[in-house]
Amino acid sequence: MGPGVGDKSAVQRRKTGRTGLIAVVSALGMTMTLAGCGGDSVSPSDVTLKLVAADYGDSKANSSQKYWDELTKEYESDHPGVKVDVSVYSWTDVDRKVKEMVDAGNAPDMAQIGAYADYAAKGQLYRVDELLSIPVQANFVSQLSDAGQTNNTQYGMPFASSTRLLFYNKTLFSQAGLTPPESWNGLAAAAKVLKSEGVTFPYALPLGPEEAQAETMQWLLSGGGAYTDDVGTYSIDSEQNIKTFTWLKDELVGKGLTGPVAPAKLNRADAFAAFARGEVGMLNGHPSLMQAAAKKGVQFGMVPMPGVNGRAKATMGVADWMMAFKKNGHAEQIGDFLDFVYDDKNVLAFSHHYDLLPVTTSASEAMAADEDDQDLAPFLDQLPASVLYPVGKTSWAGISADIKKQIAKAVTPAGSPTGIFSSLQLTATAADSAS
């Protein structure tokens, strides 16, 4: 774990040290470039590219629109025949907005959203090898590149990524004489002591509908399982997965170690807010929690997720995606613009501003070597061993929604992990066969 982790000054130091760079380059972008495709050729002087992107900011002042405006201004100044029109929408609206545009026959040239598989399955997207220059395509972090594939062909380009770590409140741990846990039993023992010390949420277990699939996956991985097996087949009802949730039900939830709010009612945002108020001993978190906690003066540490008998061998990774639609052609111009977006300075600027991990190998190496980025180093260290959602499956969106609705029932007093996981498996198998 790098120095300065959980230290407010370290977060601020990195932020302020990057302001000049961020002002010059906006980087919400992932790239797709295309070597011209016959009839797709359009005179550069006639082209306006349409990009719909998600907003990673939490206020108007921090909106991703500002980044895109700066980025496109710089690009257009060197490419007078090409205009790039960027519309930024909240995460609540952006996926729906793109779907509406596509359904109406008005697909944007590019979309930076949460999922690509449905569009790829319908033949609406360019393949990545049709788009990106070879150096750019080869520069993606391999786990992220692999996750962008449907049927062994890459259509989705990683745009932003993050991993998860176990956050713990250093003050509460110090007062209780605890050290960070390395195993499940250690986590349960620490939670028991924290409860005896009056901590509201010894371990916060957000299985509410906001992001239950994420908390679930992190625990499944820590137990040696996952949503899919090594060949990509759904394995939700595996023995390891059922054992993991049986342990959660019996050893954490059943013993009152997850706080006064039922896991089914606790959303990630609420758990993060409680951590920032100093009410949580431990929880799984991603990089954005660092700033929220530091702003409130919470002293925290971060360690890899505990496993059954020691550190977990894998952690969860998350990526958002860029894709290019065939509808309007413009392939050559799209490709050139997106090669610019994927330049290291742009990838790093975006990552720095929103506390996300770079999606390219060269930018990741630059971040790892930069002393000002040591607060993100523990997350970056987890990326090579990370496992992502099975986003290449068109069935995943529906299965993820089912997990959000059902999974918390497995840890209720009357709940059956075996029953819930078996039901989810049946649904997943049927959906996968139909897709």
Go through the PLM ranges and name each one.
Residues 356, 376-427:
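C-terminal capping/gating helix-and-loop segments adjacent to ligand/active sites or protein-protein/ligand interfaces
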Residues 114-163, 215-217, 301, 371:
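Hinge/lid segment of periplasmic solute-binding proteins
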Residues 62, 129-140, 201-210, 224-244, ...:
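Short, solvent-exposed loop/beta-turn-alpha elements that line the ligand-binding surface or hinge
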Residues 74-140, 176-182, 272-274, 282, ...:
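Extracytoplasmic "Venus flytrap"/periplasmic binding protein-like
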Residues 191-193, 197, 233-262:
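Glycine-centered hinge/linker elements that transmit conformational signals in sensory
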Residues 109, 136-172, 312-314, 386-393:
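A structural signal for short loop-to-beta-strand junctions that line the ligand-binding cleft
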Residues 76, 246-333:
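Extracytoplasmic/periplasmic substrate-binding proteins
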Residues 2-117, 309, 333, 349, ...:
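Conserved N-terminal structural module of periplasmic/extracytoplasmic solute-binding proteins
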